[in-house]
Regions:
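Short coil/turn segments at secondary-structure boundaries
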Residues: 79, 115-122, 160-164
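Generic anion/oxyanion-binding catalytic loop in active/binding sites
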Residues: 77, 84, 116, 158, ...
Length: 443
């Protein structure tokens, strides 16, 4: 399993999940549609939006990612991203205007601890104000402790190759928990650990298996600490779901941390695309997509992702911590599928999952605004689009999905008469073998 994990990480499964080969699965014709209810998600459903620290804040201190960008001259320069650091009151107000209950942000370790022996009170004061503004706008903060970014001095020590990294990490994270537990946040310890490992393998020659063990230890220890400090806390580490290979990719992680998750946090974006379906290279191999916007969007796949974890953790709450759809620089997609289409279709499948007995409790849209997608500003995920490359004013322009999400939140779902714009794909293109063993249909 360790050797397999290393190979998977090196292959980049977490961000190019649809290109990962799995055992051959026939693309069986789905059975005739049968009636299926998709009732309201309920008044207690936790609608939210999501962002991360480094991707949005700008004015970045020295960190591993600042250096990775410097080491890759072909990447977009970071500059000040979309400047959430200066514009957070307006962005938080935009989120509140959607009617959502949760605003997810990251707390950047690099901003809080510039050297091993010093803490920056100005960094803490910034997050004090952000979190208080979220609360003042009637939303609950969801705080991510580690969204792949750590101080430059920690990289100098070897990053996650350093045997002392877990203790350095815990020293900071305990301070963060002590400071903000009284605000009653929801906690995400480590964002998408397998994708995190993938980036560290590529950029810092990190040993994948070692980092998996270290990240799991960090999660488990801070989970216990949060529960000591904050009564009734909700703590998770969200997985980046990999259609067609979830057990192989995230299984080793869940074996290590599954006993210390108060809810299962799932990030779902893309379906499975067998390489043989897109042959275009002279040697007969599949072409690598130019960008995320070319990866297969299968909204019904979120049903199988939730089903997967509902079966593995019966009765455990399920929260979609991230979900969205990329476009290329905000341009209309070649297939004509809009952000509103994708959002409504996805919510339809959330309602189907809930109606079928899955304990779905929350959904965060990724993301409130466009941001820096770990090397590029070209992939756009935002409800509000921002042209970080050419607009010096960084204007937030609402997409068609803003009004759609506002209506969805107000109604706690799509209408009972709603029919998805994008009907289910052939089962072998969604999440095999599950999507072929028991395919869902639209009545």
């Amino acid at each position: 399993m360790r050797t397999r994990l290393h190979r998977l990480v090196l292959a980049g499964v977490a961000t190019a999940s649809t290109l990962l080969p799995v055992a051959a699965v026939g693309s069986a014709t789905p059975p005739a549609p049968t009636a299926a209810a998709h009732g309201s998600l309920g008044e207690n459903f936790m609608w939210g939006v999501a962002a991360s620290g480094f991707q949005s804040e700008g004015h970045a201190p020295d960190s591993n990612w600042e250096r990775y960008i410097q080491n890759n001259p072909d990447w977009d320069r970071y500059r000040n991203s979309i400047d959430f650091r200066s514009r957070y009151p307006n962005d938080i107000a935009l989120a509140a205007g959607l009617g959502v209950k949760v605003f997810r942000i990251g707390i950047e370790w690099a901003r809080l601890q510039p050297t091993p022996d010093t803490w920056d009170e100005n960094g803490f004061a910034f997050y004090d104000s952000v979190i208080d503004t979220i609360l003042e706008n009637g939303m609950q903060p969801m705080l991510t402790l580690d969204h792949w970014v750590y101080p430059g001095w920690a990289l100098d020590r070897g990053g996650w190759n350093n045997p002392g990294m877990v203790q350095d990490w815990l020293t900071n994270m305990r301070k963060v928990v002590d400071r903000y537990a009284s605000r009653n946040p929801v906690w995400v310890t480590v964002n998408e650990p397998v994708a995190y490992i993938m980036h560290e393998v590529r950029q810092n020659d990190t040993v994948a298996d070692h980092m998996l063990d270290e990240v799991a230890q960090a999660h488990n220890e801070i989970y216990d600490y949060i529960h000591q400090v904050q009564r009734g806390a909700l703590v998770t580490s969200n997985v980046g779901y990999v259609a067609g290979a979830e057990n192989k990719v995230n299984g080793p992680l869940m074996e290590r941390i599954g006993g210390k998750l108060d809810f299962i946090g799932v990030d779902y974006y893309f379906g499975y695309e067998p390489p043989s379906n897109s042959v275009s290279q002279p040697d007969g191999s599949a072409a690598t997509p130019k960008g995320m916007w070319e990866l297969p969007v299968r909204p019904e796949g979120i049903y199988y992702a939730l089903q997967h974890y509902s079966e593995k953790f019966p009765g455990k709450p399920l929260w979609v911590v991230e979900n969205g759809m990329p476009t290329e620089d905000g341009k209309p997609r070649a297939d004509g599928y809009t952000r509103s289409d994708h959002l409504r279709d996805t919510v339809y499948w959330l309602q189907r999952a809930k109606a079928d007995g899955m304990n779905v409790v929350g959904y965060n849209y990724w993301s409130l605004t466009d941001n820096y997608e770990w090397s590029s500003y070209t992939p756009r995920f935002g409800l509000f689009t921002v042209d970080a490359k050419s607009d010096p004013n960084l204007k937030r322009t609402p997409t068609d999905a803003v009004d759609s999400y506002r209506r969805i939140v107000a109604a706690n779902g799509v209408p009972s008469t709603y029919v998805p714009v994008r009907l289910p794909s052939e089962c072998g293109l969604v999440d095999p073998p599950a999507s072929c063993d028991d395919p869902v249909t639209v009545p």
